[in-house]
């Protein structure tokens, strides 16, 4: 199959860019963008490679994505080696095919076609690419955004190429994401012999009523754009492994995916009040990995919906479900942010794949979005 989108995707897949190692992917993208007149600024932080590229001036549409991928798992379980792209029955297999090297290829090819047809486009077209999205995300998009904000860089619209679709490309568009707040909680007790509980203070027993009440809380109601806030306990650890020793500490880690109905400070206050109510001795550490954000109907959402309807003849659902993405950092710049990418059914899985025709379709959608906003 000869297609510039597929060929570029295959070239990217062949580079085993396990997060945060870029493995040469960005050099490939930069070469293509510079060839059509983009100015490229490398913005590396620690072990992470990033770049910000732009062409033109004025109202700015940026395409954002990541070159890094998650580990492939057991390579012997793949139908072909995970970093050797293969097409079978119209499906392109390889780690990163859907998340998100296919989107990157579609973006770049769309830009090449757009510039060829609109060499003097009136707005500014930009790219924000990182090699640290799948792992810590500490030195990737967030650092680039901070640097751009420090110099008052303009960003009006941003399309993130995360795999948003469920069954066919464009059936779901993400116009927002929930916030994510993690609590690392240690309940302190006194270690002792199980036969002499009066000489010890078992933190598991002490914390049980607190945890029971915590999981029963209804944090908020859903609203027009977001599902109700959810809380899930992710990890619990206590004890020495011996059956005759009561633990001295209980560690509990739980995560909130919260809507715009709440703030992280409201959640923290409610948890701390509950800890005090149960008279627990505790140490707590919070990690806010992202605030909720929402892009209402406007020029970007309308352009994305128009592109999907034009090429796939379906009306996309606008959803805010799922995990976090780098869109949460970009939204801080005041930009309208939307995610549109391929079908996500196999992301992070053995035999990750994407319909090759979907990537061709995605490139056309991206180009039409460019034409509506910055031509």
Curated annotation (Swiss-Prot):
This is Succinyl-diaminopimelate desuccinylase. HAMAP family: DapE. SUPFAM superfamilies: Bacterial exopeptidase dimerisation domain, Zn-dependent exopeptidases. Pathway: Amino-acid biosynthesis; L-lysine biosynthesis via DAP pathway; LL-2,6-diaminopimelate from (S)-tetrahydrodipicolinate (succinylase route): step 3/3. The lineage of its organism: Bacteria, Pseudomonadati, Pseudomonadota, Gammaproteobacteria, Enterobacterales. Binds 2 Zn(2+) or Co(2+) ions per subunit. Belongs to the peptidase M20A family. DapE subfamily. Its cofactor is Zn(2+); Co(2+). The gene is dapE. It catalyses: N-succinyl-(2S,6S)-2,6-diaminopimelate + H2O = (2S,6S)-2,6-diaminopimelate + succinate. One of its GO terms (molecular function) is succinyl-diaminopimelate desuccinylase activity. Keywords: Amino-acid biosynthesis, Cobalt, Diaminopimelate biosynthesis, Hydrolase, Lysine biosynthesis, Metal-binding, Zinc. The active site is at residues 68, 133. PROSITE patterns: ARGE_DAPE_CPG2_1, ARGE_DAPE_CPG2_2. Its EC number is 3.5.1.18. It is an enzyme of class 3 (hydrolase). Disulfide bonds: none annotated. Catalyzes the hydrolysis of N-succinyl-L,L-diaminopimelic acid (SDAP), forming succinate and LL-2,6-diaminopimelate (DAP), an intermediate involved in the bacterial biosynthesis of lysine and meso-diaminopimelic acid, an essential component of bacterial cell walls. GO terms for biological process: diaminopimelate biosynthetic process; L-arginine biosynthetic process; lysine biosynthetic process via diaminopimelate. It comes from the Bacteria. Zn(2+) 1 binds at residues 66, 99, 162. Homodimer. Zn(2+) 2 binds at residues 99, 134, 348.
């Amino acid at each position: 199959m000869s297609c510039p989108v597929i060929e570029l995707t295959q070239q990217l897949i062949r580079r085993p860019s396990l997060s945060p190692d870029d493995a040469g992917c960005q050099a490939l993208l930069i070469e293509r963008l510079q060839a059509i007149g983009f100015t490229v600024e490398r913005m590396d932080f620690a072990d992470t490679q990033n770049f910000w590229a732009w062409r033109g001036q004025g109202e700015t549409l940026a395409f954002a994505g990541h070159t890094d991928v998650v580990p492939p798992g057991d390579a012997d379980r793949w139908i072909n080696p995970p970093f050797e792209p293969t097409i079978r029955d119209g499906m392109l297999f390889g780690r990163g095919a859907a998340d998100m090297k296919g989107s990157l290829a579609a973006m770049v090819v769309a830009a090449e076609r757009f510039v060829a047809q609109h060499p003097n486009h009136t707005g500014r077209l930009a790219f924000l690419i990182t090699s640290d999205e799948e792992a810590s995300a500490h030195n990737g998009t967030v650092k680039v955004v901070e640097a751009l904000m420090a110099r008052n860089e303009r960003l009006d619209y941003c399309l993130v190429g995360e795999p948003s679709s469920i069954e066919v490309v464009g059936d779901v568009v993400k116009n927002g994401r929930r916030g994510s707040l993690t609590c690392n909680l240690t309940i302190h007790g006194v270690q002792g012999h199980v036969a002499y509980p009066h000489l010890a203070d078992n933190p598991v027993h002490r914390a049980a009523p607190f945890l029971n009440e915590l999981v029963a809380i209804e944090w908020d109601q859903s609203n027009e754009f977001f599902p109700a806030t959810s809380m899930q306990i992710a990890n619990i650890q206590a004890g020495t492994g011996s059956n005759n020793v009561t633990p001295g500490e209980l560690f509990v880690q739980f995560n909130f995916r919260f809507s715009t109905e709440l703030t992280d400070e409201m959640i923290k206050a409610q948890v701390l009040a509950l800890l005090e109510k149960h008279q627990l001795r505790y140490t707590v550490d919070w990690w806010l990995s992202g605030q909720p954000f929402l892009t209402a109907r406007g020029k970007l959402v309308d352009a994305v919906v128009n592109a999907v309807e034009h090429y796939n003849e379906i009306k996309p659902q606008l959803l805010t479900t799922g995990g976090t993405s780098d869109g949460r950092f970009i939204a801080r710049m005041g930009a309208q942010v939307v995610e549109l990418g391929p079908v996500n059914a196999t992301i992070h899985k053995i035999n990750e794949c994407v319909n090759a025709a979907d990537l061709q379709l995605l490139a056309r959608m991206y180009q039409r979005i460019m034409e509506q906003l910055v031509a």
